[in-house]
Regions:
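Conserved protein kinase catalytic core
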Residues: 10, 44, 126-128
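Active-site catalytic loop in hydrolytic enzyme cores
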Residues: 70, 75-76, 80, 96-182
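Cys-nucleophile CN-hydrolase/nitrilase-fold catalytic domain and related Cys-dependent amidase chemistry
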Residues: 12, 24-113
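Short beta-strand segments enriched in small/hydrophobic residues
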Residues: 1-6
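Glycine-/small-residue-rich active-site loops that bind phosphorylated ligands and cofactors
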Residues: 7-10, 161
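Short amphipathic alpha-helical segment that frequently serves as the phosphate-/nucleotide-binding helix
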Residues: 13-20
């Protein structure tokens, strides 16, 4: 199921609650996978189009405040929702890495229907103004996840216009690919 719904922008608690409801609905409707867009949690940082304005600084601070850690209470809730619905979930998040003292990544989180964290993919190279908010990812997350229905992978947005990330997933035999865009 492609989740076509907006988050509660820059409110991670409300967005997680909404995501859990959407996951439950997708499960009730018979979906195998619920796929959310790029940084659905807590929302795509559209403020990046207004660089160096007062709005940018205020929004950037709020965005950082609403980024999530992996694992953390937000992923715990999403994992519980996936388990209750009996479906896999792929959701884009703004991931705060405490080890880097403030780096935020545009990450895709893969959650199994058993409620386990299968993995994450950090966007390799943020595009244009995104670089003012997100750090560069790495290739560790270019992984295809074996599921009972096929081999699952995903990339964020403009990564689909770069040949090597997709090629890496193709070489691993991806069959179901989540193309997460804002």
């Amino acid at each position: 199921a492609a989740i076509q719904a907006a988050p509660v922008y820059f409110d991670k608690a409300a967005s997680v609650e909404k995501a859990c409801g959407l996951i439950a609905e997708a499960g009730r409707l018979g979906a195998t996978v619920a796929a959310f867009g790029e940084t659905w949690l807590p929302g795509y940082p559209f403020f990046i189009e207004a660089p160096l304005s007062d709005l940018w600084w205020e929004a950037a601070a709020l965005y950082l405040e609403n980024a999530i850690t992996l694992p953390g209470p937000e992923t715990d809730a999403l994992c519980a929702a996936a388990r209750a619905a009996g479906i896999d979930v792929v959701i884009g998040v703004a991931e705060l890495d405490p080890a880097t003292r403030g780096s935020v990544y545009a990450s895709l989180v893969f959650i199994g229907r058993d409620g386990s964290l299968l993995g994450r993919h950090r966007k390799l190279k943020p595009t244009h103004h995104e670089r003012s908010v997100w750090a560069d990812g790495d290739a560790k997350g270019l992984v295809v996840h074996q599921r009972d229905y096929g081999r699952l992978s995903g990339l964020n947005c403009w990564e689909h216009n770069i040949m090597l990330p997709g090629f890496a997933l193709i070489c691993q035999g991806t069959q179901i690919h989540i193309a997460a865009w804002p």
